[in-house]
Every structure is written in C-alpha cells, then in structure tokens.
Amino acid sequence: MKESIHEDLNMRARERHGKDMINDSYFYDFRSNIYGGQMPVEFQRMFLAGDGNELVAKACAVHSSSMLGYNFFHWIKEYPLTIRWSDRKEVTYNQVCFEEKMPVLVGTTPANMDIVLRNQNEDVLFIESKFLEYTNSNRFKLSPTYNEPRKYYTKGVQWGHLISSIDTKLPTQYWEGIVQEIRHLIAITNWIEGKTDVGGYWYQGIGDVRFIHLVFEPKEVYSEHSAFLAYKERYSELHAKLEENNLVPSALKMEFMTYSDLWKIVRDMDNLPKPLKDYLDSHYMVFAK
C-alpha cells in the first residue's frame, strides 16, 4: 500500500511546530503556516476581503492552498519573478494580489481569483492554485443561474451549451476545481472584452494576458498521485470543450502548470534569499514529484 502525502505533511509539521498545532493537521494561527511568521497588513486585508474566511480557518491547515500560494508569491515585489512561457515569451512580474474579486454573472457573487500577478507593462497572470483539494470527491455542480443566457455579460448561449455538455453522472471525483476554472474563465473573458468594471487597480489596460491552473503534484510514491493524474485529465477534457465552443478569447493564453515547474524557476533565482528557498523546499517541494 502506498504512503499518504497528507500523513507525511502532518508528521513533518508536528516535528517542526508541534506546540503550535491544535490537532494533527491544523495550526492555532495561520502565522505558523507562512514563511517568516508574519504577514504584511496589505496581504491580510486581501485574504480577509475574500469569501473563504481564509485567515481564520483554512489558512491554518497544513495543506492550505492559499498559504501555499502566499509563500510562493508574496515576495515578488522585492524579488521579481521571470517566467519563460511555452510560447517562448519571457515575462517578468513584480506585483501580486490575492483573492481578487471578479464579476462572473449579472447580479451574482463575484469569483475570488486566487492569485493575480502583473507588471508595469500591464501584463497580467491569473492563477487558479490547487494544493491537494483534488484528493477529495464531489459532483460537478453549478448554480442553475449558469443555464440562463441572459445572466451572462457575453456568450451566454455558448457557455450554457458547454456546461450542459459536461456529464454530471460521471463517477464522483473532484469537480470543484473544474467549476472554479469555468467561473474564473467567464470572469476573465468579461474583463478582457470590457464587459465589467472590476475596479481601479487591475483594469488599466491589457498587455500579455495569461491564465494558469497551478497544481501541486505529489511524488509517485504517494497514493494521492493517481488523483492528480485524474484531475489533470479532467482539466484537459474541459479545455477541449472550450476550444470546441470557441470560448477562450484570442488574447488569452492558458496553461496547466505544476508547482514543480514553478519551483525549477524559483530555486534558480540568484537573488532570492536562501532561507526562503529552503523553506519552500522543506515545507512543500520535498513531497512533490
């Protein structure tokens, strides 16, 4: 029987921070779950403004996706992150926002984009981040409102067709990430096509625009690795349907990326402090493929 990454993550956390943990997998305080033990007020406000009550509950989990994202990106203003994309374009990002609210449907609750990076050239990178959420199971479920074309800012009929084409009778697996991907893509499409005003900070013009699904891939020795592969397959199936229905704006470039891919870039940054690299490695990447 294969090992569980959840068990190894929890065991390593207890070894380091046992006195700071309320049980096997949760800290008393989110500060025990971040590099340096302190979060700037500007970032605290971003997380507290989201809908997930992130800093009070979710961020205290050893397996917190939001704190994984925070630890990997909060520093880019001081140490800009340069990514060479698959289309060979190189982009440097030096601004970050967490839990950015973006309108999806008319008169409904906005989506919270996990991470948004940008730079002075108005290049924007939207990130949907996943740690180990895909090891859970749930059915594909979107509000009935998504079947009403009039509720969309644009392409309501096409979106409704795509959503209805997804087989809700498939075996129970992790579908929430696919639902979030759809909601976020609708929001980004609204933004690119100028259908919504998302409020001053991000919408100042558009340069290079990308949307990545950034997912943590466990080592193959872990039983959860098969769930990662299944989730990646569902993502690929969704993107085939997106292309079939002509729903991805031509200005938007989309990719599936793992934290291991990102780590190869981050660990080779000469100016990034070694203690930060060591933290990312020991807390996360030693468990990754």
Show the residue positions of the predicted features.
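Charged, terminal alpha-helix-loop-beta segments
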Residues: 1-289
